[in-house]
């Protein structure tokens, strides 16, 4: 897959990775870091707050990279404090709201997201501004 990632990078396209889930080694944050080490300024999205059920590994492995995270399939599994820890680690400017629809109800995911207690400006960034910037929709 490395040639695909290199071409996406050459074209300025971010790639979304399913990250986490300790039931398999295929999607660990470490695996994503292996790609980033080969393409150092690679822009990608690590789904599920960087690594479903492997959030500490995600924060350790993916620090200092151009990784964005999303909130999909995670907010039901962590406390608001744990979610905030990951969001603040990667930065509000590198976090995007996600639902993993149709697996989860968008309405319930939004309720969980708003329960995190961020202010209007941060919510606006995570709900759409970061996505628009990353995918150059605002240009």
Residue ranges and their predicted role:
Residues 99-106:
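Short glycine/proline-rich, acidic loop/turn segments that cap or connect secondary-structure elements
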Residues 1-96:
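Catalytic pocket-lining loop regions of alpha/beta-barrel enzymes
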């Amino acid at each position: 897959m490395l040639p695909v990632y290199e071409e996406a990078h050459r074209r300025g396209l971010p790639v979304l990775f399913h990250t986490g889930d300790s039931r398999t080694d295929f999607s660990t944050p470490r695996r994503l870091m292996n790609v980033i080490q080969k393409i150092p300024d690679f822009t990608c999205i690590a789904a599920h707050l960087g690594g479903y059920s492997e959030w500490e590994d995600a924060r350790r492995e993916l620090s200092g990279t151009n990784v964005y995270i999303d909130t999909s399939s995670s907010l039901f599994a962590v406390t608001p404090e744990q979610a905030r820890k990951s969001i603040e680690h990667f930065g509000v400017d590198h976090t995007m709201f996600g639902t993993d629809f149709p697996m989860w109800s968008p309405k319930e995911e939004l309720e969980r997201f708003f329960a995190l207690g961020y202010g209007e400006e941060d919510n606006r960034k995570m709900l759409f501004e970061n996505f628009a910037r990353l995918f150059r929709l605002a240009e």
